[in-house]
Regions:
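Bacterial N-terminal signal peptides that target proteins for export
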Residues: 1-12
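Conserved nucleotide-sugar donor-binding subdomain of glycosyltransferases
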Residues: 15
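Short cysteine/histidine-rich metal-coordination sites, predominantly Zn2+-binding motifs
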Residues: 97-107, 117-132
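C-terminal motif of bacterial Sec signal peptides marking the signal peptidase cleavage site
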Residues: 18-22
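N-terminal pre-ligand scaffold of iron-sulfur
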Residues: 24-97, 111-115, 129-148
Length: 148
């Protein structure tokens, strides 16, 4: 009889766990991310948009491309161009000097100065996927991984 009770308790606990995990009201932010391991020389003529602060360039890589933004003389950020809401391809949008990425499909807008957080639109809790970057003074390394 004790074995039957333990099995019943285990089944009840398993059912409760499945229900609690499956009924979350929060939207999971899973953006597909492709291989983004690359190296560029941001001060070269190949990337004129990165020759000044607040400049940007689109790169191949990742899932639907990468946007690299120069935020300071030696500082860069790199974001996946896939919208967390509907997987549309993001593009830089003019916003009075603010660096904002916009999804043409759902209208969501993301601040590149605030770690890719949502400014407005359909997505309220999902930020852009940010790639790891490292600049050694000449070469900018971009990767899905934290180590270089």
């Amino acid at each position: 009889m004790a074995r039957r009770n333990r099995v019943a308790v285990a089944l009840v606990l398993l059912s409760v766990t499945v229900l609690l995990c499956g009924c979350s009201k929060e939207r999971m932010c899973r953006v597909p991310v492709g291989d983004a391991t690359c190296q560029i020389e941001p001060d070269s003529p190949l990337y004129p948009g990165l020759n000044s602060t607040s400049g940007y360039e689109y790169l191949y890589g990742g899932y639907q491309g990468i946007v690299v933004i120069r935020t300071g003389w030696r500082d860069f950020v790199a974001y996946e161009r896939t919208c967390p809401h509907d997987k549309g391809v993001l593009r830089m949008a003019p916003d009075y000097g603010n660096m904002v990425l916009e999804c043409p499909d759902c209208g969501s807008r993301f601040s590149t100065f605030a770690e890719g957080t949502t400014v407005e639109g359909s997505v309220t809790s999902c930020s852009l996927y940010q790639y790891a970057t490292y600049f050694d003074g000449r070469i900018l390394y971009i990767s899905n991984y934290e180590t270089f």
